[in-house]
């Protein structure tokens, strides 16, 4: 048997039945929806309803919660900073902080707690970076390139120290 000899089984494919086209069509008048009621109406499907069987969302246990105090940090990779310096969007002599990263287009979004520095990519310039957080690998990579990273304290940490 070859690929060009493959065929569907006889009778396995049907033409779709057009609905509401007379009694002789087999799907006329009510189009297989029965008579009246909620399910006969247009646009109705009961999400999560499984015909009286206990639905999945009730069978599963409740777990977890949403932390309303969760802080969202914008990730910025070293490779992106390096590329921005080479293209002239960032000045390697100046301190690279959140404001500079926003102007360069590397960070956007208003509800962020700050910037987190990550180590993806190579940093070819010794720069001073001020961020809210940084990975250990990113800190090592910046220091290896001859730069420094200052991890800023949050307001809560500053109050705890005082």
Curated annotation (Swiss-Prot):
Cellular component terms (Gene Ontology): cytosolic large ribosomal subunit
One Pfam entry name: Ribosomal_L27A
Family annotation (InterPro entries): Ribosomal_uL15, Ribosomal_uL15/eL18, Ribosomal_uL15/eL18_sf, Ribosomal_uL15_bac-type, Ribosomal_uL15_CS
Region (Disordered): 1-39
Comp. bias intervals (Gly residues): 21-35
A GO MF term: rRNA binding
Biased composition (Basic and acidic residues): 1-13
Any single GO BP term: translation
UniProt entry tagged with the keyword rRNA-binding: yes
Keyword terms, alphabetized: Ribonucleoprotein, Ribosomal protein, RNA-binding, rRNA-binding
Assembly and interaction partners: Part of the 50S ribosomal subunit.
Family named by the database record: Belongs to the universal ribosomal protein uL15 family.
Job description of the protein: Binds to the 23S rRNA.
Name of the protein this chain belongs to: Large ribosomal subunit protein uL15
Native organism: Gluconobacter oxydans (strain 621H)
Gene name for this UniProt entry: rplO
């Amino acid at each position: 048997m070859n690929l060009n000899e493959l065929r569907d089984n006889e009778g396995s494919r049907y033409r779709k039945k057009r609905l509401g086209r007379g009694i002789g069509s087999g799907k006329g008048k009510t189009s297989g929806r029965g008579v009246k009621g909620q399910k006969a109406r247009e646009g109705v499907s009961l999400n999560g309803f499984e015909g009286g069987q206990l639905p999945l969302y009730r069978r599963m246990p409740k777990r977890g919660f949403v932390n309303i105090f969760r802080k969202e940090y914008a990730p910025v990779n070293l490779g992106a900073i390096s590329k921005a310096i080479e293209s002239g969007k960032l000045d390697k002599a100046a301190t690279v902080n959140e404001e500079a990263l926003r102007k360069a287009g590397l960070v956007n979004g208003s509800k962020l707690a700050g910037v987190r520095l990550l180590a993806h990519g190579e940093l070819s310039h010794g720069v001073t970076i001020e961020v809210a957080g940084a990975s250990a690998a990113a800190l090592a990579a910046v220091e290896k390139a001859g730069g420094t990273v200052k991890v800023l304290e949050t307001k809560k940490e500053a109050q705890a120290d005082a």
